[in-house]
Amino acid sequence: MNRGVLESSPVQQLMAAGNPNWWNVSGGMRPPPPLMGHQQAPLPPHMTPNNNYLRPRMMPTPFPHFLPSPATSSSSSSSSPSLPNNPNLSSWLESNDLPPESWSLSQLLLGGLMMGEEERLEMMNHHNHHDEQQHHGFQGKIRLENWEEQVLSHQQASMVAVDIKQEGNINNNNGYVISSPNSPPNKSCVTTTTTTSLNSNDDNINNNNNMLDFSSNHNGLHLSEGRHTPPDRSSECNSLEIGGSTNKKPRLQPSPSSQSTLKVRKEKLGGRIAALHQLVSPFGKTDTASVLSEAIGYIRFLQSQIEALSHPYFGTTASGNMRHQQHLQGDRSCIFPEDPGQLVNDQCMKRRGASSSSTDNQNASEEPKKDLRSRGLCLVPISCTLQVGSDNGADYWAPALGSAGFH
């Protein structure tokens, strides 16, 4: 009896759990499965992983702890209904060479539980497939946004999936269904995979953002350098232009004071030329060249007059007289004929030359006199004055009556 109590304890626990698959045993009816296209309703809080998916699915040997022996089960099987038509259970019984009559109600209940779990696994496979499609769609969007981010996230997601598959294979080999990739009824498993993949995607995005930030910072550095470089280039260009300007000869720009002095000098020069024109030829040509030529001729005439008047004081020999005459003859061409008052008669010049020669001879015969150059033109010979006065008649050199010698 104690074994019967022990055998019925898991059945009571399963009945208390409220599994809807018990409809298979009681009436052969089961609730309608949810639609394949819709998402599965959230599991109740009592359907935890410890209660649903940590139980043995298909044990290779008869259940030594939960299933009674054929001798003890015959008493309890009399009150149980007939074995339902379960192909999976019948195939398992045939493979283990056990008669169907030797199973009790607990075994039938376990068979129904396994059938319900298989259907739930199929539903969860569909749900997982739908989640994977959504996840792949999200990855496709990320792939369109950033190809590098998608590659990194896909690699990490594939690595996580491989790890999960390996864990699922190990758990299936041990006989437990914990976290297979095709059956994710465990919300914690699904959330861990999705969160790990999303976290990996976020990490990749953050890393890529960091890389982008680094590149932007790098570009910022270049841009800042570029912002600093245009003044440098302009300064270089300015320096080159300054260097080129220094290589060129700068123009000598006169100061305003020098310009004013030049203007003043020009005005003064023009005024002086006008005054010279009034002295030389007031009724002649007014251009600068003609005024200068007339002024030059007039100056030469004055020089010849001065030499003729100062000749008795300088010439002492005949050779000097000859040179003086030649010089006077050469200067006659420069005398202006249009000024008759300034001309000297040739005869007067000849007489002056003869008198000067006679006086020179007398001076040579007499004692040498002192040179009168230091005294200037204060003394004039009487012979020269008489000749000039007798020839012209209007000369102011006329001597006084009864005077002889020097004034």
From Swiss-Prot:
Molecular function as annotated in GO: DNA binding; DNA-binding transcription factor activity; protein dimerization activity
InterPro entries reported in the protein's UniProt record: bHLH95_bHLH (IPR045239), bHLH_dom (IPR011598), HLH_DNA-bd_sf (IPR036638), IND-like (IPR045843)
GO biological process: regulation of DNA-templated transcription; response to abscisic acid
Localization in the cell: Nucleus
Bias (Polar residues) ranges: 354-365
Chain positions covered by the region annotation Disordered: 56-93, 176-260, 350-370
Basic and acidic residues bias spans: 224-235
Record's subunit section: Homodimer.
Name used for this protein in its record: Transcription factor bHLH68
